[in-house]
Amino acid sequence: MKVVLLQDVKGLGKKDSVVEVNDGYARNYLIPRKLAVPATEGLEKHLKEKKEAEQKKKEKELEAAKDLASKLEKSQIIIKAKAGENGKLFGSITNKEIAEEIKKQLGFDINKKKIELDDPIKLIGSYDVVIRLYQGVVAKLKVHVTAS
């Protein structure tokens, strides 16, 4: 019997997948526990359309991320911070401040978790900051830190 899984079932498949199982297993275990429903042509067609829509959505997100990455690669931001005579900042610049400056100066809203800094910036100078926008899409942004 063909069934469509409503949840992930260990050893059988993931949610929304169509699998072939024994009739008794489907009727006595999967269907009563609402883990699966019998597969019909309409349901299979609906699942196929849903997967195609998800694929198109992922492709759009990937294109948007690539477009944003190319814009960020060409851009740079300048952050002014209080610093001592030897170029050491009072405090530090974290990925949160970089995300805020990107929004303020460039107009792009980027989640601070996507900005990769090994350590907060503590000295005046120029830095290449890595931003992971999407799976496999990485941008490097020039960040110039100056004394205010």
From Swiss-Prot:
This is Large ribosomal subunit protein bL9. It comes from the Bacteria. Belongs to the bacterial ribosomal protein bL9 family. It comes from Caldicellulosiruptor bescii (strain ATCC BAA-1888 / DSM 6725 / KCTC 15123 / Z-1320). Keywords: Ribonucleoprotein, Ribosomal protein, RNA-binding, rRNA-binding. NCBIfam families: L9. Binds to the 23S rRNA. It holds the Pfam family Ribosomal_L9_C.
